[in-house]
């Protein structure tokens, strides 16, 4: 055990309670990166990374922020292992997908982008399933 309590149930519950904050923090970092990239492209008048810029905005900033806000609006969504699985699928792939697009644009390597996109799709699908389950549980569907 690297540090006391790292793998305890209490630590896992703590992560799930703050999943909204983790998604919102990650989203804000993506926003800053995307705006910086956009400014750099504008200053240089080189828009060859525009696909990276748009994916960093939509996958990183918008989607992650919407995940975070949804978890904040519906705290019951963060209960259970599906929320943790969703975070573990979406957070890394939300960063790796735009990074893979960078590798595709600059080096012609499509595999990282494709792999990250598939993991991102799995996370998005899981989130959709979680929302539908919550809607049925609350009698909204």
Regions found by a protein language model. Name each.
Residues 2-141:
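Hydrophobic alpha-helical transmembrane segments of multi-pass integral membrane proteins
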């Amino acid at each position: 055990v690297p540090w006391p309590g790292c793998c305890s149930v209490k630590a896992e519950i703590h992560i799930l309670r703050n999943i909204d904050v983790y998604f919102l923090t990650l989203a804000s970092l993506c926003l800053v990166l995307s705006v910086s990239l956009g400014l750099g492209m504008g200053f240089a008048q080189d828009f060859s990374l525009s696909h990276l810029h748009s994916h960093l905005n939509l996958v990183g900033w918008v989607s992650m922020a919407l995940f975070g806000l949804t978890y904040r609006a519906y705290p019951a969504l963060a209960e259970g292992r599906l929320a943790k699985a969703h975070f573990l699928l979406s957070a890394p792939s939300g960063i790796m997908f735009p990074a893979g697009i960078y590798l595709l644009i600059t080096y012609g390597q499509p595999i990282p982008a494709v792999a990250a996109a598939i993991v991102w799709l799995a996370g998005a699908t899981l989130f959709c399933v979680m929302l539908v389950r919550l809607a049925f549980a609350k009698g909204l569907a």
